[in-house]
A protein has these predicted regions:
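Second-shell loop/turn segments in exported
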Residues: 47-53, 116-125
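Short N-terminal segments immediately surrounding and downstream of signal-peptide cleavage
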Residues: 29-46
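Bacterial N-terminal signal peptides
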Residues: 12-20
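Boundary at the C-terminal end of the N-terminal hydrophobic targeting segment
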Residues: 25-27
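Bacterial N-terminal signal peptides that target proteins for export
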Residues: 2-13
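Mature extracytoplasmic domains of secretory-pathway proteins
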Residues: 104-107, 120
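A cross-family detector of function-defining hotspots
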Residues: 57-104, 124-177
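Short, solvent-exposed aromatic-acidic interface loops
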Residues: 109-116, 175-177
Length: 177
């Protein structure tokens, strides 16, 4: 009975370890234009994509997915290290974009001009009324940066940032702080 009891304990321990490890591995892919994920705990920043582009993707993939392919209603411009996406209906300010650094994507952003294309929780954040509504949707931020011109709510160790600047809302995803 002693050996069998220890064996069952080892099996239970191994199963719990697999369960804990699988929750980190099973983070959902989050395509900003398609995914209906409503809880930020269900994805990692590295799993967020903008028209198929994720943090860490190569410049070649950015060219293939954003620059060469025509996205309906979207105008694409390359500005220095940024690939900016504009709404063709009113191309005054960028609605989304990525930054390339050393040939890889290290930053993705979307603004409230992107809300009509966004899905899931970020559609609600971009259409929201402000900081308190964002906190209701995403939960309490890990830390806040406040100044006279903007407020930054930092989530996921600072790799996901919600920036409020006047009436503008920007959601930023980055490789790390």
């Amino acid at each position: 009975m002693g050996v069998r009891g220890r064996g069952m304990g080892v099996v239970a321990w191994a199963c719990s370890l697999v369960f804990v490890m699988s929750s980190a591995v099973n983070a959902e892919q989050y395509e900003l234009t398609e995914s209906e994920v409503m809880d930020i705990a269900h994805f990692n920043t590295s799993d967020v994509s903008l028209f198929g582009i994720k943090i860490g993707d190569s410049e070649a993939k950015v060219k293939d997915n954003l620059i060469k392919i025509k996205i309906p209603g979207v105008k694409v411009e390359v500005q220095d290290v940024f690939v900016m996406l504009y709404d063709k209906r009113s191309p005054s300010n960028a609605m989304a974009g990525v930054r390339l650094l050393d040939g890889k994507v290290d930053y993705i952003f979307i603004t409230q001009r992107f809300a009509h294309l966004a899905a899931g929780v970020f559609r609600l954040v971009l259409r929201g009324e402000g900081i308190e509504e964002t906190r209701k949707l995403l939960g309490k931020e890990e830390f806040t940066e406040d100044s006279t011109t903007f407020t930054r709510l930092n989530y996921k160790g600072g790799t996901m940032v919600i920036l409020f600047s006047g009436r503008d809302i920007t959601v930023e995803f980055n490789a790390g702080v």
